[in-house]
Amino acid sequence: MGKLKEYLINNLTEEEIKRIEGLSNLSTTLDNHRRWMLLGLHVGQRVSDLLSLKPHQIREADDGLYLDFFQKKTRKAITVGVKNPLIVDWLSNFDFKPISDQAFNRGLKMVAQKAGIDTMTEGYQMDRSTRRRSLGLYPKYQLISSHSLRRTFATLHYGKVPTPLIMEITGHSKETTFLSYIGKTRNKDHIADTFLRYLNF
């Protein structure tokens, strides 16, 4: 149960994402973190694949852009479409500077703090005295990490986009693993409900 809680607490809401989008007057470095952060929320990739994105992986689409990723963990190629005007504009000019995983994780928390994402939230933090993760109540921005981006992507699209399509993008091979990842349990009617939405006869 503790592991499931850890998954659930790190998600960002749509309202919180809009607050991040609306941030201004950030330093150049912090705004670069914000851009990578918002891109991660729109493409659902692991941080190692996200931060290795290069201009040659970007292609024009009829209604946005295609991003071609090679997922290192699964050894699979995947193309993700993006159409958010802000993200498309940044990608078209490739307004992203290289950044390390460690610096990115620190920057995410700072961006979230600037956006006022500070609701006291149950989660895990490293206790420096014991060197173990400790469950407690913390301002939500302290709990945001690069893992939060992919999980938020999956959670916000779940129930709106067919689950196999989300799994293809995030790189999950088993539905049970995917559902655990976003803190859901398998609903025996989910497949039937999804099918009914697509029926046209």
Label every PLM stretch briefly:
Residues 1-47:
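Basic, Lys/Arg- and aromatic-enriched nucleic-acid-binding interface segment
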Residues 6-7, 72-131:
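C-terminal catalytic core of Y-nucleophile DNA break-rejoin enzymes
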Residues 36, 48-53, 166:
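Alpha-helix N-cap/helix-start motif at helix boundaries, enriched for small hydrophobics
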Residues 40-42, 157-158, 182:
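Short amphipathic helical patch at the helix-1/turn junction of helix-turn-helix
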